[in-house]
Amino acid sequence: MAELKPFIFVPLYIYPTETSWQPLLAAAAKHPQLFFKVVVNPKNGPGPEALPDANYVTGLRALASLANVCVLGYIHCSWGERDQAELENDIMVYAGWTVRSPGIRIDGIFIDESPANAALVGYVAATARFVRKTFANPATVVYNPGVVVHVAFYQAADFIVIFENRASEWPSDFVQSNLSKLGPELRRKSIVIAHSCASQGLQLKLGRRLFQEYRIPGQLVTTQAGYASWCPYWESYWDEMRRWYNRSITLEGTSAGV
């Protein structure tokens, strides 16, 4: 019987000052049974330097000190148009951080703007293979096409973001019809990012439903329109989700409640 712990997915696109990452650091430290997958993105990727600036190094070391935080480096593939060599260079820079600066831990790569065209399965899979070949430890690879994609994409990915949109779009016939094509084993490798949620109540309701009914382990539901600032209800959101973190999501033999 397949089991998977749910997690909160955090695009941490906030510059690290002394306090700007504290909402995440405090949540992870207070409740070590909660799991977070966190994307860091210094310069639309790692940037040209061998290491990010001192503030990033300090922030990354703080993240690395938390065993319940998985740190992913951001790269983008421009929907399949970016040259493979450029992607590989970004990946090598992230892998180099852990060598050049003790205390930094990069656990994998987040591939943004991943293509949804099934003809490009091999393109993204080659990137995933390069990640795993480059990192010394087993690496997590997350694709972000933002929509449901062909099953073949799941073969090389650990997780795929199947929805990144306004929360109001989640109940739409288009989304739900595509979601119904994903069986339990694919849902267990899926992530939902729902932004611009209209209220705190709707935020918490959707968060619960993603875990309880849809059996999707990874999520971020926020009232913010983007990821450059914290949701004002961040603490109540993760506190509500916390009650699910002590329960494994059992996916084998369950219905998804679409």
Predicted regions mapped to residue ranges:
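Glycan-processing catalytic domains of CAZymes
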Residues: M1-V258
